Every structure is written in structure tokens, then in C-alpha cells.
A protein has these predicted regions:
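Extended intrinsically disordered, low-complexity coil regions enriched in Ser, Thr, Gly, Ala
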Residues: 72-92, 109-119
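Short, structured motif recognition centered on aromatic/hydrophobic residues
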Residues: 58-66, 96-97
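Acidic, glycine/proline-rich low-complexity segments that act as flexible tails and inter-domain linkers
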Residues: 1-56, 110-135
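Amphipathic alpha-helical segments within well-ordered protein domains
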Residues: 45, 80-84, 94-101
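C-terminal structural segments of small proteins and small subunits
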Residues: 103-107
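Residue-level marker of alpha-helix boundaries and capping positions
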Residues: 35, 70-71
């Protein structure tokens, strides 16, 4: 029997990532099943289920953190999809990345943007051509 934290976490994960999140956990079953449980119980059961931030706000923070870390493209892919699933627009995702340029530099922002581009293409999402720079 799974813990209450696991049940809450799995519910949060399904709301954000649908079947994609569960697939990530399933890939760990044969090598590190406890790691999958930790992700569900701690990240989603304890952290994502807290009051005070919406799922949209949590996903913006998550994709920003993953961009900042760098080298997290698989996790960034999961959370960009999650961001879209909870109603964040592609434009807001890209604008969030652009905001990071002065703090983390072009290479990390470019890497994250290319992950987003792949996901947007897979989901047939088209961004507007407006640069939104006020010039």
C-alpha cells in the first residue's frame, strides 16, 4: 500500500504531466524504484501540493530553475509540457527564458529555448511574430 504522500503526489503529477510524468517514474522501476517514489512523495506530494502558489506559478519557477541549472534538458522537457498542460502560454514560457539572459547567459537560455521549440512543434503550437520589445 502506497503512502498518503504518494497518493497526493501522484494526483499532482497527473494533473501537471498526465501520462508523461508517470512514464518517467516507470523508467526508474527496474533500476531505482525508490527514486521514483521520492520524486512523487517529496517533489509532488510535499512541495507541489503546498498552499500559496498556483500550479502555473510553480511550473514557471521550475522551468526557470532547470534553465538556470543547465544540463537538465530531459527534466526541462517534462516541465515545459507540464507548464503548457496547466495553462501557461508558449509566449510566456519564451518570455520567461528571455528574462533569464542577464543572469544566466545566452547558452543556457538558447538550450532551454531549443527544448521549448521541439515541444511546441510536437504539439503544433505556433508563437506570434510579435517581439514584444516596444520598439
Amino acid at each position: 500500500m502506497k503512502s498518503k504522500r504518494f497518493e497526493i503526489g501522484l494526483e499532482q503529477l497527473q494533473e501537471i504531466d498526465g501520462a508523461s510524468g508517470e512514464k518517467v517514474i516507470q523508467t526508474l522501476e527496474d533500476i531505482a524504484p525508490d527514486l521514483g517514489e521520492y520524486i512523487i512523495e517529496f517533489a509532488f506530494g510535499d512541495i507541489y501540493s503546498r498552499q500559496g502558489l498556483s500550479l502555473q506559478e510553480r511550473e514557471v519557477i521550475t522551468i526557470t530553475s532547470l534553465l538556470t541549472l543547465g544540463g537538465c534538458e530531459p527534466q526541462l522537457e517534462v516541465h515545459i509540457n507540464g507548464s503548457l498542460n496547466v495553462g501557461i502560454s508558449p509566449e510566456k514560457i519564451i518570455e520567461t527564458f528571455i528574462q533569464c539572459i542577464p543572469y544566466v547567459g545566452f547558452p543556457k537560455v538558447l538550450n532551454a529555448t531549443f527544448v521549448a521549440k521541439k515541444i511546441f512543434s510536437e504539439r503544433n503550437l505556433i508563437l506570434g511574430s510579435n517581439t514584444n520589445d516596444g520598439r
